[in-house]
């Protein structure tokens, strides 16, 4: 009998065991390699940017400016897809349920990402778990405005008058950040502002200009053209300091100390999108918004360019959810 046969058997047995281990690990190794492979080949086709606002709105215009530059940076078309309605939840749901492959993104503001989910019953998605931040794009302050013929001349007069009498304020929706700004003023200043929720911004603007409602709280981007044309007068912006585009307009904190609510447009993606894809998008979008040519176009439209990491953006959204949830409880606002 050949003395080398046992050694040969041992070698064969070792090879068989090694092959078996490789076969068992193959699915795991393949699964781990898929995200990396996707990131290396992404994007290989056009990307859809779902916008939580109507075509022609200031949110839509901001999204198109960024998408145009992002297309050039990525070498693929970024197609803007406006999906207005339901305070942004229609657009958010479309993206939350999309395949997390980097080819479907959401462009939305705080109302759609924070306020509407807190104030809407039975949403078919979880805004915190089903969506994740890609990058901030632009700070868009909310503004408090009156019609040009209003007797209210400044924010101090509004606050003083609303402490003794009910004053109605128009917003573009009951589940909007605009409404919570009004409720915040009530809580901090002891005013009696009463919300009139419109289905969208345009009819609210029409009634403010016509004098049917005395006060408007809405995004500065939509109000800015009316303010510049003289049809509305700005009383305050919702930020902690004055806005560069309207330096003569006071911040709300000048009349109500401690009150400031940052409002931001953010690009989001379905949860589970490869981190490499999200990081690449974050880098490109930060570069785009830091470009003075883009930043200078934001300001006349009521926006100030923003940059930040995915982690910092996620933290900001979490903080706002906590803040607004407490405000809703204090003001007895229920979904």
UniProtKB/Swiss-Prot annotation:
N-terminal signal peptide: 1-39
GO (cellular component) term, any one: periplasmic space
Localisation: Periplasm
Keyword terms of this UniProt record: Periplasm, Signal
UniProt similarity note: Belongs to the UPF0065 (bug) family.
Name of the protein this chain belongs to: UPF0065 protein BB4329
């Amino acid at each position: 009998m050949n003395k080398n046969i046992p050694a040969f058997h041992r070698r064969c047995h070792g090879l068989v065991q090694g092959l078996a281990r490789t076969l068992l690990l193959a699915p795991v190794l393949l699964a781990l390699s898929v995200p990396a492979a996707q990131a290396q080949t992404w994007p290989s086709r056009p990307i859809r940017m779902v916008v939580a606002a109507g075509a022609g709105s200031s949110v839509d215009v901001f999204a198109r400016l960024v998408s145009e530059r992002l297309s050039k940076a990525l070498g693929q078309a970024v197609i803007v897809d406006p999906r207005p309605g339901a305070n942004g939840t229609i657009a958010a749901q479309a993206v939350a349920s999309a395949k997390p492959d980097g080819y479907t993104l959401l462009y939305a503001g705080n109302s759609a990402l924070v306020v509407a989910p807190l104030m809407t019953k039975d949403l078919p998605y979880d805004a915190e778990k089903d969506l994740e931040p890609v990058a901030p794009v632009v700070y868009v302050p909310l503004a408090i405005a009156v019609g040009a013929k209003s007797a209210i001349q400044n924010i101090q007069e509004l606050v003083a008058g609303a402490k003794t009498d009910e004053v109605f304020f128009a917003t573009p929706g009951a589940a909007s950040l605009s409404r919570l700004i009004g409720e915040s003023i009530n809580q901090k200043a002891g005013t009696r502002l009463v919300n009139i929720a419109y289905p969208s911004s345009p009819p609210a603007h029409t009634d403010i200009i016509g004098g049917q409602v005395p006060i408007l709280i809405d995004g500065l981007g939509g109000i800015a053209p009316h303010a510049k044309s003289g049809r509305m007068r700005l009383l305050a912006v919702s930020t902690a300091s004055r806005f560069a585009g309207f330096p003569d307009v006071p911040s709300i904190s000048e009349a109500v100390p401690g009150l400031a609510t940052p409002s931001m447009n953010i690009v989001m993606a379905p949860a589970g999108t490869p981190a490499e894809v999200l990081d690449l998008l974050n880098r490109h979008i930060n570069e785009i918004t830091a470009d003075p040519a883009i930043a200078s176009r934001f300001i006349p439209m009521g926006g100030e360019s923003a940059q930040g990491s995915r982690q910092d953006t996620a933290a900001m959204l979490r903080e706002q959810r906590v803040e607004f949830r407490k405000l809703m409880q204090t003001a007895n606002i229920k979904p």
